[in-house]
């Protein structure tokens, strides 16, 4: 299911001329993390990236995952044209009515003993999430 989710967003991004580079190395047994939770996390990350790349001269998305020592790490770097940040440094949705993507990603990471970090710098939005598998 995770691969199908990634392929869906990869195709969507490529249709808009975005360069996409996705390498996911996720083991069959991901411990206590459900397939649906992982699909939501990967899907939200990629959906945000595809949306952020609109209006960028050279749009790109690069996603990687790695599993080591019982920890799954997923990183995603993408170009962006516009971000909205709150005074506390957290990010606000650019979507009409607001979005929950980053909050859902962070909540899933915390639920599984992990964490998340999001940063926008010099036209690149960096997302990194880690989850404990056991």
Task: Name what the model sees in each region.
Residues 35-58, 107-108:
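Conserved ATP-binding N-box helix of the HATPase_c
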Residues 82, 121-128:
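Glycine-rich nucleotide-binding loop
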Residues 70-103:
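Glycine-rich/acidic phosphate-handling loop/turn and adjacent ATP-lid/helix
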Residues 1-16:
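Short beta-to-alpha transition helix within the HATPase_c
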Residues 113-123:
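Glycine-rich ATP-binding loops of the HATPase_c
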Residues 104-114:
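Conserved glycine-/histidine-rich ATP-lid loop and adjacent helix of the Bergerat-fold HATPase_c
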Residues 56, 60-70:
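Short beta-strand/loop element within the Bergerat-fold HATPase_c
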Residues 19-41:
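Conserved short strand/loop->alpha-helix "switch" segment adjacent to the catalytic nucleotide/phosphoryl-transfer site
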């Amino acid at each position: 299911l995770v691969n199908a989710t990634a392929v869906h967003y990869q195709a969507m991004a490529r249709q808009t001329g975005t360069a996409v580079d996705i390498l996911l190395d996720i083991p069959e047994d991901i411990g206590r993390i459900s397939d649906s939770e992982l699909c939501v996390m990967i899907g939200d990350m990629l959906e945000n990236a595809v949306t952020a790349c609109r209006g960028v001269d050279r749009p790109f998305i690069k996603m990687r995952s790695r599993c080591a020592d019982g920890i799954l790490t997923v990183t995603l770097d993408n170009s962006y044209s516009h971000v909205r940040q709150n005074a506390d440094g957290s990010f606000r949705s650019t979507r009409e009515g607001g979005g929950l993507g980053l909050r859902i990603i962070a909540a899933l990471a915390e639920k599984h003993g992990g964490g998340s970090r999001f940063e926008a710098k010099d036209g690149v939005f960096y997302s990194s999430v880690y989850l404990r598998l056991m």
